[in-house]
């Protein structure tokens, strides 16, 4: 497995379970060894480094992933980078199958005039900063008093919320490191505009994200009443999908809250004075980042109309907003893997009709035996963490089917000495961090957090992680 995030860990667990259940029938036996390679010094990928720190459900997911890794048939190799420390040829010589679960770590480019101005930031880089990504920035410019966030999904909501958060409140409830706490303490943002191209019924927010937006201390929510004038067809269409219906209902609840905040004299959700304003603009498509002296000075937005079918129509009506920083959360681009064809159009590793079998070309091409992809590496950056489970089951089913055929035709000759990979890494001077090493890092984070009355306090420097893990 390449990648120890949710996709890689879920796939490992499901593979072992399905093998135990079906292995004898398929002629494969019921036992396997899974080696899980991760380029970072610690596991969990998106769960640790891609989700806002104030999501309480995330620690439960991390706990479940950790239980899976605490399995004698799964061997964790953190701090080992595919393409640098080990190659595809190295792995194919030692394993019956290789599964890529490499996720997505880069921002999709913002293709707007002015996107290269100083003060335009991709959400992925900002998330890296506040989540303490090992190779991410340690400081972040937060001097802008007026800020714009572009995007209609959960990542945009995360970014906007963190920009409006109170530093002390965030520290008390999360594992943020000192540098992030100090950065947010100095945050000058007073006004934030969230721009969503389509309408209320087409947004992609989870209900949980919306409820977290509602309860920001010291923040007044401001919403345009006109955005909530939905026609009968749109209401009917939204009602067909349970999650969409729940989201729209929650947005109407937020609209009522915003009205109350305004009527009560610019207060937050608890009726306390609000010193920050959070504007939510639906049917608003940014068309240009405005600049002055090479820096962001504003953003131009075109009003749109969205039909019941979700199609957006531009109106030709524009409005400029004065802002000094723009964050774009318009999607991620999954990581490329050396030696594997990348599908630029689909933004994922090339695989056969989405079944996870790696192919030689993005469109069609031949299936490359023993190579697979799962999660965002397979389908592109869509779906929540839970979506990777259904992905994993499909990929594992295909893997077992292919392995069974390989047994019938004479199994591929590979080096199955379990210590072979250890010797190779040692020869190259690579010192992997195993599960026991991760537990040492985790224990230190818990002890440091306890000193401040917190459950965890995240270690951010990779050298410190290595020192702790190898002690």
Where are these regions (language model features)?
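N-terminal Rossmann-like dinucleotide/flavin-binding domain of flavoprotein oxidoreductases
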Residues: 26, 31-33, 40-97, 254-272
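Short hydrophobic core segments
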Residues: 94-103, 148-150, 321-331
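Glycine-rich Rossmann-fold phosphate-binding loop(s) that bind the pyrophosphate
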Residues: 3-5, 152-153
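Feature captures the FAD/FMN-dependent oxidoreductase FAD-binding
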Residues: 14, 62-120, 279, 287-300
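FAD-site-proximal beta/loop scaffold in flavoenzymes
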Residues: 119-137, 289, 295, 307-379
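Glycine-rich dinucleotide-binding loop and its adjacent helix/turn
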Residues: 107-186, 349-362
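C-terminal, flexible cofactor-proximal segment of oxidoreductases
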Residues: 359-362, 366-471
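Dinucleotide-binding/catalytic capping subdomain of oxidoreductase cores
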Residues: 19-36, 47, 157, 161-313, ...
């Amino acid at each position: 497995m390449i990648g120890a995030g949710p996709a890689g860990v879920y796939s490992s667990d499901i593979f072992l379970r399905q093998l135990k259940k079906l292995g004898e029938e398929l002629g494969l036996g019921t036992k396997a060894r899974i080696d899980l390679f991760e380029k970072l010094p610690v596991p969990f990928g998106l769960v640790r480094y891609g989700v806002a720190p104030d999501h309480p459900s995330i620690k439960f997911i991390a706990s479940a992933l950790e239980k899976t890794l605490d399995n004698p048939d799964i061997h964790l190799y953190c701090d080992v980078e595919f393409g640098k420390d080990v190659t595809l040829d190295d792995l194919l010589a030692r394993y019956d199958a290789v599964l890529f679960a490499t996720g997505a770590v880069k921002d999709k480019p913002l293709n707007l005039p002015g996107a290269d101005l100083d003060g335009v930031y991709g959400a992925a880089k900002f998330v890296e900063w506040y989540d303490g990504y090992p190779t991410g920035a340690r400081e972040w410019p937060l001097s802008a008093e007026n800020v714009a966030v572009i995007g209609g999904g959960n990542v945009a909501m995360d970014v906007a919320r963190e920009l409006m958060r109170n530093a002390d409140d965030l520290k008390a409830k999360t594992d943020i490191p000192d540098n992030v706490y100090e950065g947010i303490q100095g945050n000058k943002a007073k006004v934030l505009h969230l721009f969503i191209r389509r309408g209320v019924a087409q947004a992609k927010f989870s209900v949980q994200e919306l409820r977290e937006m509602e309860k920001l201390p010291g923040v007044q929510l401001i919403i345009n009443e006109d955005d909530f004038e939905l026609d009968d067809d749109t209401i009917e269409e939204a009602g067909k999908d349970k999650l969409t219906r729940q989201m729209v209902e929650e947005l109407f609840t937020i609209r009522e809250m915003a009205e109350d905040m305004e009527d009560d004299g610019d207060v937050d959700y608890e009726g306390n004075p609000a010193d920050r304003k959070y504007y939510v603009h639906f049917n608003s498509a940014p068309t240009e980042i405005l600049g002055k002296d090479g820096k962001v000075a504003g953003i131009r937005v075109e009003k749109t109309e969205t039909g019941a079918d979700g199609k957006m129509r531009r109106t030709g009506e524009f409005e400029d907003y004065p802002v000094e920083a723009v964050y774009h959360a318009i999607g991620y681009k999954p990581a490329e893997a050396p030696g594997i064809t990348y599908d630029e159009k689909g933004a994922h590793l090339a695989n056969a009709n989405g079944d996870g079998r790696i192919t030689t070309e993005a469109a069609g091409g031949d299936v490359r035996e023993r190579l697979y992809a799962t999660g965002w590496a397979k389908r592109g950056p869509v779906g929540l963490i839970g979506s990777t489970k259904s992905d994993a089951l499909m990929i594992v089913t295909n893997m077992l089917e292919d392995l069974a055929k390989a047994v019938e035709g004479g199994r591929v000759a590979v080096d199955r000495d379990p210590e072979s990979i250890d010797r190779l890494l040692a020869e190259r001077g690579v010192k992997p961090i195993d599960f026991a090493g991760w537990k040492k890092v985790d224990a230190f984070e818990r002890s440091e957090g306890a000193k401040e009355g917190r459950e965890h306090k995240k270690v951010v420097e990779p050298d410190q992680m290595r020192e702790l893990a190898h002690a």
